[in-house]
Amino acid sequence: EFDEYCAERNIELVPSIATFGHLYKVLRTKTFHELSEVEEAEGTAFSFYERMCHHTLNIMDERAYEFVCRLIDEYSSLFRSNLFNINCDETFDLGKGRGKKLADQIGSHAMYIQWVNRVCEHVKSLGKRPMFWGDIIAAHPETIRELPEDIICMTWDYSLAPGDTNVRKLWENGAHQYLCPGVQGWNQTIHLLDIAYENIKKMASFA
């Protein structure tokens, strides 16, 4: 219904779902805790710190890939857009738990690239163009070349004074980018509009 509502108003509603990090609540459950990079995730007390820092899939477990593919299949069918945002942001604990042995061998960023490529392959098999958040790839912008050529990198910076360094370096390495400002409305009741306006203005100028 929401997709239909948007389409009637010439708005493209793009599906967006976590496929790597930001799965804290899922990975604390009895059903899925074994898919967490962090061991002993099940049954721990809820923590706002843990919610933001320890929420990444264990890509060594093939069940994690099957889980993500199932999520994508179920979700993508609800949208007419040919775009699909796989997120893949803030994977802070990648290679620090169950995947440490592989990280010691090839590095956590190589693990990141491997996983994003696998997820993109599945998204593309459904006729969708993948998008992902660019905070992790920005640390090694040259590795954007190792991802699908048509992937869209969503470069974000929500601060009062965003810089253009990541934007420029990713552009120099051939990235297709959407620049994403923020409206300063998280963890509070009222948006910080002065900061939001300044952030949007600067990010738009970089674009």
Language-model-derived ranges and their functions:
Residues E90-F92, D150, R168-Y197:
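Active-site clefts of carbohydrate-active enzymes
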Residues V123-R129, E172-Q177, S205-F206:
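Structural alpha-beta junctions
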Residues V38-E42, Y112, T155-Y158, Q177-C180, ...:
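Glycine-rich loops and low-complexity Gly/Arg-rich segments
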Residues E1-C153, V183-G185:
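Aromatic-lined carbohydrate-binding surfaces of glycoside hydrolases
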Residues C69-I72, G163-V167, A196-F206:
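Short, acidic/polar
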Residues I137-H140, M154-T165, G185-Y197:
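Acidic-and-aromatic substrate-binding clefts and catalytic sites of carbohydrate-active enzymes
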Residues R145, P162-N173:
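Noncatalytic carbohydrate-binding groove/subsite architecture in carbohydrate-active enzymes
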